Amino acid sequence: NKFKNIFSFSSELKKYNFDKIFIYYPSPRIFIACKLAGIKDIYHYPLFKKKNLHLINAAQKFTASVLNIEKCQTYTKIHINENKLKSVSTYFDKSKFNIVIGAGSSGPTTKWGTDNYSNLINELNKLNKFNFFILCGPNEKLIAQEIMDKVEGDNITDLSNKNISEVIPFIASADMYVGNDSFGSHISSQSGKPSL
């Protein structure tokens, strides 16, 4: 029930005692829930104008208007603690091109496959100019191990035993990300590194 959702969302919002909220969607229900939650300053898209809504242009225009600035950039840049970046620097050979391989994925239909990744790594290893880091979730260690078993050379590091906050500096420090999971691609992009 749509009305029940308004009240449950309003109750959830009340818990946080927000003074101000920014709604990046033309939703009357979210607006009403915010009003019911007692939020004083509610900034929102024009209501009932969902048709032909261009998400990027609308967000840019809205943000520029609310912040009273002329132009709002559409890209983000992630900021990573310098100590975390330094802590992973010993894993990188700066004389080589360092690639994070994102072999894990949330669904089986989006996986490129261990054979494809190991073949790619073996082909690139013929040039002797690369280091590789295998990024998989903790429940995908077998994928990382299977790739590593098929790769000739010792220029590969398994990241599957690391948590998210530990792998982010690896992705940000690498020269490139190649993978099927969007997490690595997002971090790579926000770090100004190419991804494929």
Give residue spans per PLM region:
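Catalytic machinery of carbohydrate-active enzymes
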Residues: N1-L196
